[in-house]
């Protein structure tokens, strides 16, 4: 393990030198690739540095314990050795987790599809609530988000469907745990008897594909244009700027109406289509690798009920790991860190267990 960590440290230094090369400014694609790789290694290098410092301190304390004759000093050295041994063991465990094989897609940006399910108007309102939750979480993480497409419901403020693009560092690696069915239990504003209604919204988190990931034949595509129902000033309902693309072999559809020109909407819709096809390809690869563990945390099973938001009890429960929080208002404002961190830690523990078997 130490040899592997040393090699990573040297690679990190090489990347640092490469990124300082002024000529790299002329090749933005290579710069982004190197910078992403550099960022991915930084956490491992920092953890390894901390491990090495504490291991050196432990060695010095053990030497003092072995050579010291003064009783009081020996007792102090013994206490320090015990404390440092515990710290070094924790850091070593952390390094083992960091060295787990990274999923290639983890560093990708994402497209999130949020769809109202059972529950009618209440489900569409909760779809809007989840949209705001993810937008605020993205803001807290320093990520960028953009609405690509949406379908409003009959109730004001509700959505039958919302499609978001979120871009930033390690977005899919963080957001992939959100795929699945989110259930809400609350009393609708229109409920005169005060009865609790249960509704559901499905969330699909897809790693954004690059052009090289998926080959799409133009002959397999059908392009339709229609009038945008969203923003666009004088273009609204007058010019067909919205674009819908259908991939004929699979029947997969991607649409975008949020850009101001037909060309921009077409480019966005193509990106969404590539992402959907890449997601299918990725799922097939994961299945072939038999990488489906007992836990459903990262399998992305979108038919599985993953979380319940109980408003009367101000409770959020993630059913995959038995996690419960009574900070529902804060979570709905984007404070998802505690939930996602618990899911990541559980997933890492399961993967480490699998690696050691």
UniProtKB/Swiss-Prot annotation:
Any one Gene Ontology cellular component term annotated for this protein: cytoplasm
InterPro entries, A to Z: PCRF (IPR005139), Pep_chain_release_fac_I (IPR000352), Pep_chain_release_fac_I_sf (IPR045853), Prokaryotic/Mito_RF (IPR050057), RF-1 (IPR004373)
PTM comment: Methylated by PrmC. Methylation increases the termination efficiency of RF1.
Keyword Protein biosynthesis in annotation: yes
Subcellular location: Cytoplasm
Record's keyword annotation contains Protein biosynthesis: yes
Record keywords: Cytoplasm, Methylation, Protein biosynthesis
Cited PROSITE patterns: RF_PROK_I
GO molecular function: translation release factor activity, codon specific
N5-methylglutamine: residues carrying this PTM: 234
Pfam families according to UniProt: PCRF, RF-1
Classification via NCBIfam families: prfA, PRK00591.1
Family indicated by similarity: Belongs to the prokaryotic/mitochondrial release factor family.
HAMAP family: Rel_fac_1 (MF_00093)
Function of the molecule: Peptide chain release factor 1 directs the termination of translation in response to the peptide chain termination codons UAG and UAA.
Annotated protein name in UniProt: Peptide chain release factor 1
